[in-house]
Amino acid sequence: MASTKPLSRFWEWGKNIVCVGRNYADHVKEMRSTVLSEPVLFLKPSTAYAPEGSPVLMPAYCRNLHHEVELGVLLGKRGEAIPEAAAMDYVAGYALCLDMTARDVQEECKKKGLPWTLAKSFTSSCPVSAFVPKEKIPDPHALRLWLKVNGELRQEGKTSSMIFSIPYIISYVSKIITLEEGDLILTGTPKGVGPIKENDEIEAGIDGVVSMRFKVKRSEY
């Protein structure tokens, strides 16, 4: 798939980060939530990107920052109302991603019936790995994701456990949001989410594909 911009640096120019919540039943259970008939969507700004080598910044207003490891899907061309059967034709590649979440803030937002923006969209809330070309992952539904904090395994799960498949998600999202080249879709997290603190080291990976490391620092704001 020809690209007019370097997908290897997607975090520098990609516009939209679309996130899917509640896409693994075991995570839905641990969060005491309910599996819904359609994907739960929320957005992160492009300033949420944190490529490997930069720190994960814990907002000053957050007292309970959680890690969520996810498979990210990179779009290679513009599309709207994409048929599910053609959805994979729009995929240029993948990235391992973290959906960093201010859990205490999110819980307050839920209680008040407010959007999750304060909990999900802060600077560096979307750490990402290097770009992985589509050809290196023949089946994105046959991957093992894992995450460690200070060497301790916290999360592991298989993408085969997704409730909504990647083609379905792409099609569903594109009927609401026009997707563009360089856009990233986070496809949900398996169970095992948990807290991190300042100076922790997060290591995450996709077995046999890619891994990444990040240090956690406290933001001044």
From Swiss-Prot:
Residues binding oxalate = 22, 120
**The keyword DNA repair is assigned to this record:** no
Q: Note the Pfam families from the entry.
A: FAA_hydrolase
Localization (cell) = Mitochondrion; Cytoplasm, Cytosol
**Where along this sequence does the record place binding of Mg(2+)?**
68, 70, 99
Catalytic reaction equation(s)? oxaloacetate = enol-oxaloacetate; oxaloacetate + H(+) = pyruvate + CO2; a 3-acylpyruvate + H2O = a carboxylate + pyruvate + H(+); acetylpyruvate + H2O = acetate + pyruvate + H(+)
PTM sites of type Phosphoserine: 37
Q: Recorded E.C. number(s)?
A: 5.3.2.2, 3.7.1.5, 4.1.1.112
Record PANTHER family:
ACYLPYRUVASE, ACYLPYRUVASE FAHD1, MITOCHONDRIAL
Alphabetized NCBIfam families for the sequence: PRK10691.1 (NF007967)
Its function?
Tautomerase that converts enol-oxaloacetate, a strong inhibitor of succinate dehydrogenase, to the physiological keto form of oxaloacetate. It is thereby required to maximize aerobic respiration efficiency by preventing succinate dehydrogenase inhibition. Also acts as a weak oxaloacetate decarboxylase (ODx), catalyzing the decarboxylation of oxaloacetate (OAA) to pyruvate and CO(2), and as such is likely a regulatory enzyme in the TCA cycle. Also displays acylpyruvase activity, being able to hydrolyze acetylpyruvate and fumarylpyruvate in vitro.
Give the similarity note.
Belongs to the FAH family.
Q: What is this protein called?
A: Oxaloacetate tautomerase FAHD1, mitochondrial
Origin organism is Mus musculus
